[in-house]
């Protein structure tokens, strides 16, 4: 299937590792130009080298502190200065920081919202004029915690609920401009962040086996590449009639949150 993404300029926040990295590589495979917004210069440079070697595409790298609105604006300005256009945005960056109701406080909760959803709005706000010009696309990466809860993670769960709400809201607000907006919901996906969490468990191997045994399709973790495949389709012209939708790429996991059942 031709996704018609060649030479399309696509922003990926948090594109220097995990799911974001896989999205950038899949975009490059389709001939698109990934613009990586991240604060890990080392990882960005590594990924850019790999993309050039594998696909002959030069990714555009912008060191960005996503919790700083000035850094966000500067990043978008630099992309527009370089290319003069933007066809797509993937809001992806975030971290499950464990801010709970019992052990957290107001300041920690607001900080969690800022780092996990504030930049979804900020980046989209700065990119909007370019997306209006290109009749582009937004894809918001979200966590299943917004749907199922998890426990001990009020900040992250609330932020992801907001990501889903923004997906619905923007899909309506942006209808006049031909911009479609969708969300991809991630559950148990094997990323460096997830691997770090597993390693902190009392018995990592046993915990991982317990989780995967409750994932219906294949009893295995979702891969970042599987998330990327869905995201890249949603960025393509083949999905322009789809908007305001939530796509669960999770091996059927969220139908019943089996890890806590």
Residue ranges and their predicted role:
Residues 9, 16-17:
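Conserved glycine-rich cofactor-binding loop
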Residues 143:
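Residue(s) in the substrate-gating loop at a strand-loop-helix junction
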Residues 100-113, 211:
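Substrate-binding pocket helix/loop in short-chain dehydrogenase/reductase
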Residues 1, 148, 232, 243-261:
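Short C-terminal tail/terminal secondary-structure segment
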Residues 90, 175, 180, 242-244:
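Short, small/polar-rich loop/turn modules that mediate ligand/substrate recognition or access, typified
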Residues 124, 159, 167:
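Active-site helix of classical SDR
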Residues 129, 172-176, 240:
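Alpha-helical segment proximal to the catalytic Tyr-Lys
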């Amino acid at each position: 299937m031709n996704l018609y993404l060649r030479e399309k300029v696509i922003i990926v926040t948090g594109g220097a590792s995990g799911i974001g990295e896989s999205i950038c590589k899949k975009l490059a495979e389709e001939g698109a130009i990934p613009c990586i917004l991240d604060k890990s210069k080392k990882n960005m440079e590594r990924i850019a080298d790999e993309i050039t070697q594998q696909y002959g595409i030069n990714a555009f790298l912008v060191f960005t502190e996503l919790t700083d609105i000035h850094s966000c604006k500067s990043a978008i300005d630099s992309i527009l200065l370089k290319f003069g256009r933007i066809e797509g945005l993937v809001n992806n960056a975030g971290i499950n920081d464990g801010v709970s109701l019992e052990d957290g406080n107001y300041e920690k909760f607001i900080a969690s919202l800022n780092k996990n959803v504030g930049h979804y709005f900020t980046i989209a706000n700065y990119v909007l004029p370019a997306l209006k010009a290109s009749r582009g696309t937004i894809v918001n990466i979200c966590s299943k915690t917004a749907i199922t809860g998890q426990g001990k993670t009020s900040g992250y769960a609330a932020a992801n609920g907001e990501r889903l709400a923004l997906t619905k809201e923007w899909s309506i607000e942006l209808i006049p401009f031909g911009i479609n907006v969708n969300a991809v919901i991630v559950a148990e996906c094997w990323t460096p962040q997830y691997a770090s969490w597993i390693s902190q468990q009392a018995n990592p191997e046993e915990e991982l086996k317990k989780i995967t045994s409750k994932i219906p399709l294949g009893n295995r973790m979702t891969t970042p590449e599987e998330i990327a495949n869905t995201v890249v389709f949603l960025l393509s012209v083949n999905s322009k009639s789809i908007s305001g939708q939530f796509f669960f790429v999770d091996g059927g996991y969220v139908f019943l949150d089996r890890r806590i059942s």
